[in-house]
Amino acid sequence: MRLPIILDTDPGIDDAAAIAAALFAPELDLQLMTTVAGNVSVEKTTRNALQLLHFWNADVPLAQGASMPLVRPLRDAASVHGESGMEGYDFVEHQRQPLAKPAFQAIRDALMHAAEPITLVAIGPLTNIALLLTQYPECVFNIRRLVIMGGSAGRGNFTPNAEFNIAIDPEAAAKVFHSGLEIVMCGLDVTNRALLAADYLATLPTLNQTGKMLHALFSHYRSGSMSSGLRMHDLCAIAWLARPELFTLQPCFVAVETQGTWTAGTTVVDIEGRLGQPANAQVALDIDVEGFQRWAAEVIALAP
């Protein structure tokens, strides 16, 4: 039986690969997509998400979400993904529009009308998820688990200690980690190792239309290089859902720093239990890199 999921995303070049996997992995049933400001503005992430859904002719509703973090100004990652968020490929024009409701409302409605609890997958800043929990706290009973691409038990990639998705909206992340939800955290400890290798990247243009599109986007992606391999951060969250055996998880207490002058957005991951707090997340600390690469190639080959 396919696992029903809702994907909250901020496309983003590596988001495109994650969305492909969410659509075409046979284990998953993507029921709703929502967008959030992160890699670029929410207007751009929404446009990019709609372009991808049209590219794949996917019958998945999409709702536009938060345009700003809860309390902070938005800082984006256009330097990594390009000004539009998905530079490098000319998508055809389309008439698709987002739902006439905000993301947190769309998620709430999907959860409350579902026949079974749904897994949320958040591969951008956690603003929409925090808004959902604030406005509709009763929804926690309809959420099977939350799988996050974000955080780090070690170094950051946006500041010395903070990973981008958490650093953009630390207050939202803090609320989410203290929500009582069952959380799986796929952070930089595994995503920095989740490379698509250069020899595989070179085969993409001859694979299928999805391969051609991803190759064009990847050529403009600044998280690695086409010659040394590209980090597929967001794809890890989908990989865990489809192939959890590829990851080594450890239950940990995770706190999010919101006050530090230099450390805001840091995920304090208490691997050794020194803080004496109960675990609130399953944290991915290791990944079978070759297994991940095989799975990624398999799922991209399933796309048109």
Swiss-Prot record:
Domain of life where this protein originates: Bacteria
A single GO BP: purine nucleobase metabolic process
Annotated S-S bridges: none
Gene3D superfamilies found in the cross-reference section: Ribonucleoside hydrolase-like
Keywords: Glycosidase, Hydrolase
Active site, per annotation: 233
Purpose of the protein: Hydrolyzes both purine and pyrimidine ribonucleosides with a broad-substrate specificity.
Family, per entry: Belongs to the IUNH family. RihC subfamily.
PANTHER family per the UniProt record, alphabetical: INOSINE-URIDINE PREFERRING NUCLEOSIDE HYDROLASE, NON-SPECIFIC RIBONUCLEOSIDE HYDROLASE RIHC
Stated name of the protein: Non-specific ribonucleoside hydrolase RihC
Organism: Klebsiella pneumoniae subsp. pneumoniae (strain ATCC 700721 / MGH 78578)
Species lineage: Bacteria, Pseudomonadati, Pseudomonadota, Gammaproteobacteria, Enterobacterales
Gene name, Swiss-Prot/TrEMBL: rihC
